[in-house]
Amino acid sequence: MRAQPTASHYVNGRYIDDEQGAPLPVIYPATGETIAMLRSATPNVLELAIEAARAAQPAWARLKPVERGRILRRAADILRARNADLARIETLDTGKAIQETLVADAPSAADCLEYFGGAVAAYNGEAVDLGGPFAYTRREALGVCVGIGAWNYPIQIAGWKSAPALAMGNAMVFKPSENTPLSALALAEIYSEAGLPDGLFNVVQGYGDVGAGLVGHDVVAKVSVTGSVPTGRKVLSLAGSKMKHATMELGGKSPLIVFDDADIENAIGGAMLGNFYSTGQICSNGTRVFVQSGIHDRFVERLVERTKKIRIGNPLDPETQMGPLVSKAQHEKVVGYIGIGKQDGAVLACGGNVPSLQGFDGGFFVEPTVFTGVTDTMRIAREEIFGPVMSVLKFDGEDEVIDRANDTEFGLAAGVFTRDLPRAHRVIAELQAGTCWINAYNLTPVEIPFGGFKQSGIGRENSLAALALYSQLKSIYVETGDVASPY
């Protein structure tokens, strides 16, 4: 199986390569085989990309917002038209089941381009009456922005970062994760086909040194990163040393709280979505599932029953519900945490094994796993695993569960399942998390902001909040009379 792109990088409207770059193999997670070989960006490639962005950005910013938006909406239409091909690329790159990538990856990127392509035309400054004189504000582009993606939703993240940046008149240099480099190249081609001028969206591949080279470059005005907390800290430190704007969408260990009066099937469905979708590799996952004591045993019994029915296998098979983890390293990490959970005394209710699948012996598969009897101090309840490992914790009262839910360095997301809506709103108001759901989980429409509190990030993706973060505000005072001066 092969998925070799035309070249490794997309700069100034064309594919380029540099044979001096370090090899960057693309591994199909279902089999462990190499399906493409790319090259990491050299300093020369980085300079070409940043210079292309710098040169193209001013003319782009001078266009009317509606003109910029028209190109983004055209790109959204192309994304939707090619969804089947893009879903296959994403499945080969990430290992996620094709039934997921068909509905959750390129479609989300398309929604994002469409939303910002329309919203930017009405995103204006304001006028202020000062009783004779007046003032007004302008939202202006920052310049060259850098996007650094993660491997769980490659094309979605590329869309989430590039759409608001481009809509506001910026240029972007985007570095995908070295694990999943393919779909960002496809997005770059689509932008060009939609009429985006050359140099405004460039893709460069590479490891951490390439990201550091982009973040530290003097021309770059803003950095947006999706990744782990340790990665975010490094990037923020480097960006802050040069006073660059920064958006950090980082990790989590989010609480999902199920009260006694919840619809138990809906709550279980939310918990499964919040732990097993994308093989558990979602930053906002509700991996600490707090279940009130009155329904705890019944919840666990039904949860285990439903979890055992999840179909694991060939991710290109439309009937498969869960594919492999993204890489050997991630597989070793997740399996290691399952072992830690057992050692720490958690009860393995189901899963926890590496399945034997005919034809996929080299794949990075693991069964969806449920631990019960988990305490707040166990490592599986405190550290981000980023795999299909759910911890179920029992609680008695509302105040208790709020305190326990907030006892974490993270604050990306939280969820509450209950039929008592006043209680739902009351609890959500007390939870220290940036993105919350009531009687749902992990739904992230582009119209609402997405991001976290505490160590889970800075800034927001999506919604009008993202346009604000890809722009800078200029204030203009206009005098209509004489200048009052004592000199």
Swiss-Prot record:
Family annotation (Pfam families)? Aldedh
Positions contributing to K(+) 2 binding: K454, G457
> What are its cofactors?
K(+)
Sites binding NAD(+) sit at: G149, A150, W151, K175, P176, S177, E178, S228, V229, P230, T231, G251, C283, E384
Gene3D superfamilies (UniProt xref): Aldehyde Dehydrogenase, Chain A, domain 1, Aldehyde Dehydrogenase, Chain A, domain 2
Q: Which GO terms describe its biological process?
A: glycine betaine biosynthetic process from choline
Q: Which GO terms describe its molecular function?
A: betaine-aldehyde dehydrogenase (NAD+) activity; metal ion binding
Q: How is the cofactor bound?
A: Binds 2 potassium ions per subunit.
Q: Which InterPro entries match?
A: Ald_DH/histidinol_DH (IPR016161), Ald_DH_C (IPR016163), Ald_DH_CS_CYS (IPR016160), Ald_DH_CS_GLU (IPR029510), Ald_DH_N (IPR016162), Aldehyde_DH_dom (IPR015590), BADH (IPR011264)
- List modified residues, type Cysteine sulfenic acid (-SOH): C283
Q: Which UniProt keywords apply?
A: Metal-binding, NAD, NADP, Oxidation, Oxidoreductase, Potassium
What is said about its interaction partners and assembly? Dimer of dimers.
Protein family membership = Belongs to the aldehyde dehydrogenase family.
- Explain the purpose of this protein: Involved in the biosynthesis of the osmoprotectant glycine betaine. Catalyzes the irreversible oxidation of betaine aldehyde to the corresponding acid.
**What NCBIfam families is this protein classified in?**
BADH, PRK13252.1
Q: By what name is this protein known?
A: Betaine aldehyde dehydrogenase
Print the organism lineage.
Answer: Bacteria, Pseudomonadati, Pseudomonadota, Alphaproteobacteria, Hyphomicrobiales
